[in-house]
Design a protein with these regions (language model features):
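Juxtamembrane intracellular "pre-TM" segments in multi-pass secondary transporters
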Residues: 2-18, 197-244, 430-440
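Helix-loop junctions on the cytosolic side of multi-pass membrane transporters
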Residues: 104, 135, 177, 181-211, ...
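Transmembrane alpha-helix termini and helix-breaking/packing motifs in multi-pass membrane transporters
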Residues: 40-44, 98, 102-103, 159-179, ...
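Structural signal for membrane-spanning alpha-helices in multi-pass inner-membrane proteins
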Residues: 39, 94-101, 164, 168, ...
Length: 441
């Protein structure tokens, strides 16, 4: 079965999940059109990179903060209604930007406000994309569902920038924003009548039932729900340490692509800008192909914890490649391996986190871990920028690779990681509630 048939098949999981994931795909492609259009428009009108950076900083800040502050809404209210609300908010943001572009009026205040609304919508919706999966498919199809999610995300990463660049360069900012608005409208229409069932669990222990019952009978205040997300992550030791590992990955991976790669291509090997695109594309190809084919190739590795360590190893090799001055014609291969490694890390941790967390805490768990991971991006950018200034780009890249390979060894030290990573989907369902009952009270 080819990739297209696989991502559109009805055989392995529910048609509701397929509609939901394809709607997210359209939103992601539309977001790329929006981002490039706004960037091009802002730089053209202001001619100032610093003013444009203010827009980006406010957007990212709104997205990052909305995850822990509003992540509880996905546990308290209907996840599908929350997603629809976020999509409508995204459409309102796109409509504001489109109206401003149509009348040719650029206001940095209004544009920043519209982009912040978009950031809030993305920050709320992103954790739900994972936590809602058990309500849209069967337990036996959870792994397939997360792999398909990764495939569609990878395709969007490859197609989105290309479509956005073509639209902006050929027809201009307004047309790109019209396409974004149209994709959002289609995405909303795909899920507006989509019903979801309760938790997919067929194995409900007394512990899990006692955990979930208070949430339905007693409604805690919003500030308690916010703090409970952090408490759960801190008390479930495996998730606390996995969150630290995720922070360390983002600490080196985000600045690797935003700072190290452009600097290395421009200043060290002195190749044109298209080579940066080639490396990014190679990483995306690794993400795409590994989601479909890598599980079969690595079928001899039976346990998720070993797949997780393999992922850190492949990603570390990618980061080491620049530090070791690998020839430029071989470098894309290492980036493809890095993409494969990132999929192994993300998919296996997401499956365990989503299934093992009791349903009434699932979205807060995902949102809080995502928040910790996002916090590392600006810190890593600052550290890497200073390191390049003092030690050079190759030494800095070498250090990031060594850090990532060290994290591979750190996986083995995470408490109870073998216990949870080696469970079947049926055993994982609500497992954190059984092993850490006090964390969810």
């Amino acid at each position: 079965m080819n990739i297209w048939n696989w991502v559109t098949s009805y055989e392995s999981d529910n048609w509701r999940l397929l509609r939901f994931q394809w709607s997210i795909f359209l939103l992601t492609v539309g977001a790329r059109c929006n981002q490039l259009a706004v960037a091009w428009w802002a730089l053209k009108e202001t001619g100032s990179a610093s003013l444009f950076s203010i827009i980006i900083a406010c957007t990212i800040g709104a997205e990052v903060l909305s995850k822990p502050l509003l992540g509880w809404t996905g546990d308290r209210y209907s996840k599908m209604k929350i997603v629809l609300f976020c999509n409508v908010l995204t459409m309102f943001s796109a409509a504001c930007l489109l109206a401003l572009s149509f009348i040719d009026y650029f206001s940095i205040t209004l544009v920043t406000f519209a982009m912040m609304l978009l950031g809030i919508a993305v920050g709320i919706r992103d954790p739900i994309q994972s936590s809602i999966i058990p309500q849209l498919t069967l337990l036996r199809s959870i792994a397939i569902a997360f792999n398909r999610k990764a495939v569609l995300s990878s395709i969007a990463m490859l197609l989105g920038p290309a479509i956005a660049g073509l639209l902006v360069s050929t027809w201009g900012v307004t047309i790109a924003l019209i396409i974004d608005f149209a994709l959002i409208a289609i995405a909303i229409s795909m899920i507006v009548n989509l019903n979801i069932v309760g938790a997919s669990s067929t194995i409900q222990t007394q512990t899990t039932q006692s955990i979930e019952k208070p949430l339905t009978t007693i409604t805690p205040p919003w500030h308690t729900l916010i703090s409970s997300g952090f408490k759960v992550v801190f008390r479930v030791k495996i998730e606390f340490y996995l969150a630290l590992l995720a922070m360390m990955i983002n600490l080196v991976l985000f600045p690797f692509f935003t700072i190290i790669v452009p600097f290395y291509v421009q200043e060290t090997i002195q190749l044109p800008a298209w080579y940066i695109g080639l490396l990014d594309c190679s990483f995306g190809v690794g993400l795409l192909l590994s989601s479909k084919f890598l599980p079969r190739l690595l079928s001899f590795i039976r346990f998720r914890d070993r797949l997780l360590m393999t992922g850190f190893g492949l990603l570390g090799l990618n980061l080491l490649a620049i530090g070791l001055a690998v020839p430029y014609f071989i470098l894309p291969i290492f980036f493809a391996l890095g993409g494969c490694g990132l999929i192994l890390i993300n998919v296996n941790t997401a499956i365990v986190r989503t299934l093992a967390t009791p349903a009434c805490f699932r979205n807060r768990m995902v949102a809080t871990v995502s928040f910790f991971s996002s916090l590392a991006s600006p810190i890593g950018s600052l550290i890497v920028g200073l390191a390049i200034a003092h030690y050079g780009v190759e030494i800095t890249s070498l250090l990031t690779g060594v850090i990532t390979l060290t994290l591979m060894l750190g996986v083995a030290l995470v408490p109870n990681i073998r216990v949870f990573m080696r469970m079947s989907e049926d055993e994982l369902d609500g497992a954190y509630g059984r092993f850490y009952p006090s964390a969810f009270r």
